[in-house]
Each structure stands twice: as C-alpha cells, then as structure tokens.
From Swiss-Prot:
Pfam families: YqeY. PANTHER family: ALTERED INHERITANCE OF MITOCHONDRIA PROTEIN 41, MITOCHONDRIAL. It comes from Bacillus subtilis (strain 168). It comes from the Bacteria. This is Uncharacterized protein YqeY. The gene is yqeY. InterPro entries: Asn/Gln_tRNA_amidoTrase-B-like, GatB_Yqey_C_2, YqeY/Aim41, YqeY/Aim41_N. GO terms for molecular function: carbon-nitrogen ligase activity, with glutamine as amido-N-donor. Disulfide bonds: none annotated.
Length: 148
C-alpha cells in the first residue's frame, strides 16, 4: 500500500472518529504530496519521492519545535510535538544508532575517508543508503566523530 493510499484510509478513519488533530496533519501531508507531484509534473510519486516529502515535513516540524521551545511557547511546542508523533507513524522503521554506526564505518572504509575534509564524500555516499531510515543530523554527528 502506497503512502497516499494509507493517508486516504487514515483520513477516513479520523473523520469517522472525529480526531481533528490527526486529520489536520494527514491533510497537510497529503497536500504536500500532491503539490510535489504537481511540481514534478507527475500523476503519482514514487515511494522514494513520497519519503522525501515526508522527511521534509518532519524536518520542518522539528525546526519549528526547536524555535518554539527557544521562544518558550509551550502551547505551540505541545501542538508541534503531537504533529511529529502523528507523522512518525508513516515513516519506515528507523535504524538504531548501532546499525547506523556500522553503516558509517563501512561507508568510511568504502570511500577511503581519513579526515574531516572527506566528510562531504562520506555523507554523499551514506545518505542514499539510509534515506528515510535515519535522521541526517545524527548521521552527520556520527560521521564527524568517526573522522576526528
């Protein structure tokens, strides 16, 4: 089942159960997916493209969460945290830090990286492997710790 089909199914369920918050988030994600399809001039998106849109939505929410907590807006922090929890249901299972560390070490060996100057090469090689399954900032932190 594609992400769009799953969103449609959940949207119906949330309408029936009158779960307004979840319904709003699902509608926003669905709109983002449709906008991306229009932008790419396609009828439907590939699974990879859907994952990219979902990751972008998550990243926006995480950035907002950080900004709201810095501004001490607890009401908005709660709202955005709930949205994040709803969105994370649609992501594929995330890799553990140990699995990521293994992938990082393998990729560093493949690329032959030895210093922080090679970080771009490593990140470029590793991101397609873990797309949607890991947070980019965590990968960045692991790579930089291995290269230092």
């Amino acid at each position: 089942m594609s992400l769009l089909e799953r969103l449609n199914q959940d949207m119906k369920l949330y309408m029936k159960n009158r779960e307004k918050d979840k319904l709003t988030v699902v509608r926003m994600v669905k709109a983002s997916l449709q906008n991306e399809a229009i932008k790419l001039k396609k009828d439907s998106l590939t699974e990879d493209e859907e994952l990219t849109v979902l990751s972008r939505e998550l990243k926006q929410r995480k950035d907002s969460l950080q900004e709201f907590s810095n501004a001490n807006r607890l009401d908005l922090v709660d709202k955005v945290q709930k949205e994040l929890d709803i969105l994370e249901v649609y992501l594929p299972e995330q890799l553990s830090e140990e699995e990521l560390r293994t992938i990082v070490n393998e990729t560093i060996a493949e690329v032959g990286a030895s210093s922080k100057a090679d970080m771009g090469k490593v990140m470029g090689a590793i991101m397609p492997k873990v797309k949607g399954k890991a947070d980019g900032s965590l990968i960045n932190k692991l790579v930089s710790s291995q290269l230092s």
